[in-house]
Design a protein with these regions (language model features):
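Short, solvent-exposed loop/turn segments enriched in Ser/Thr/Gly
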Residues: 34-35, 45-52
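Short histidine-centered loop motifs in beta-beta connectors
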Residues: 236, 279, 283-306
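Zn2+-dependent peptidoglycan hydrolase active-site motif and core
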Residues: 240-291
Length: 388
């Protein structure tokens, strides 16, 4: 009788036992976050963390790895702050997968995941982030990365005055766009791999219709610099500081024409005419593509918040007149890491596409101006800074 009862109990337990799949083996990868993220408030009112997770597939025996999902956790929580499946991951990795192909990390290769965390405006901020990624293998089934912890940098970001005055400006290639040439550009120079332009903005002047070129212009392929709304606008110091680097005398290219290849991945190779200010110890504001002959300051000079530094132009690696603005932790472009910041005040008129800059596609319809304070404009919104 006892033997029959035991056998019945065993049969009842078997279904539950067979449902418990073994945990995936630890992934044979190296994973790390090279530069700790710092939270900032975006123009959507949310707090954001933007950073990169580097994953290297070391072993040839494993074969190619296929990332299937990514979860990001705060501290010791088991509820993820972010969950991405394989299709969603495609938009946030470099190298980008070709065509409709699956994401894959070949043996001996590295993949970079650009992580964009959006958190409520209020509430606690995690102290540490942890990453869990499930990867498929060619020979060994699924494996799992669980770790790659990184501490969140709790230092406050700098609140800046406007780099331009009044007017309307498209905040192009801005934060939140992993495929942009700013955040998406890793710079490998002399042993360092960094992202100097992580939070850079290309500020393109627009009129009340959202057009970058004045309405008298008939042929976009043959415009003059003066046809562009933002050209020659005064460029201003965003804070008190010391001029650390200046370059002038570089020519400006005709708008919307093929650009020469950069001579180097440095400020001299990319920025054309530029000014770099140190606005706090270890915090540098870079202004690039300035108008030839317009720079008013010299290295070592002290400047005050709102002081005119130069004029907006189109020198260096630039297809059209605009101001490239960024904050980083070194005076040089190469070897520096882009750091977040906020502007003390601007108006937000809503999103605009690059095509709408030139009157193509649906006409841009500005939203009601929303005042923003101590926020960073996110990618492709039209903003206006207060007049001086």
């Amino acid at each position: 009788m006892t033997r029959s009862v035991c056998l019945a109990l065993l049969l009842l337990l078997l279904p539950s036992l067979t449902l418990s799949a073994p945990a995936p083996a630890p992934a044979p990868v190296e994973a790390r976050v090279p530069f700790a993220p710092t939270p900032f408030v975006g123009s959507d009112g949310l707090r954001h963390l933007a950073y990169e997770l580097h994953i290297t597939n070391y072993y040839g025996d494993t074969g190619a790895l296929q990332p299937q999902s990514l979860q990001v956790f705060g501290d010791d929580a088991e509820t993820p702050l972010l969950s991405l499946d394989a299709p969603a991951l495609r938009d946030w990795v470099r190298p980008s997968p070709s065509g409709d192909g699956a994401i894959s990390i070949a043996a001996g290769k590295r993949m970079v995941v650009f992580v964009w965390l959006s958190l409520p405006a209020t509430g606690s901020m995690p102290h540490v982030l942890r990453h869990r990624m499930l990867l498929g293998t060619e020979r060994h089934g699924s494996v799992e990365l669980d770790g790659a912890r990184v501490a969140v940098n709790a230092a406050p970001v700098m609140a800046l005055a406007p780099p331009l005055q009044g007017g309307r400006w498209l905040a192009h290639e801005g934060p939140g766009a992993a495929q942009s040439h700013h955040w998406g550009s890793l710079v490998a120079v002399n042993g360092d791999l960094t992202i100097p332009q992580r939070f850079a903005l290309d500020l393109v002047g627009v009129d009340e219709r959202g057009r970058a070129v004045r309405p008298t212009t008939r042929d976009l392929q043959h415009t003059r610099h003066s046809d562009w709304v933002g050209y020659a606008a005064p460029v201003l110091a965003v804070a008190d500081g010391i001029v650390r680097a200046v370059r002038d005398g570089q020519p400006e290219h005709p708008p919307l024409t093929a650009q020469p290849e950069p001579s180097s991945l440095t400020a001299d190779g990319l920025f054309g005419n530029y000014v770099v200010l140190e606005i706090s110890p270890g915090v540098f504001a870079s202004y690039a593509h300035l108008r030839t002959g317009s720079i008013k300051v010299k290295p070592g000079q002290r400047v005050q918040r709102g002081q005119a530094l130069a004029q907006l132009g189109q020198s260096g690696n630039s297809a059209a007149p605009h101001l490239h603005f960024q904050l980083s932790n070194k005076a040089t472009f190469e070897g520096s890491e882009g750091i977040p910041y906020v502007f003390q005040a601007f108006d937000d008129f809503g999103p605009e596409s690059e095509a709408q800059l030139f009157g193509q596609g649906d006409a841009w319809k500005p939203g009601v101006a929303v005042p923003r304070g101590n926020q960073l404009p996110l990618n492709d919104i039209v903003i206006a800074f207060p007049p001086r």
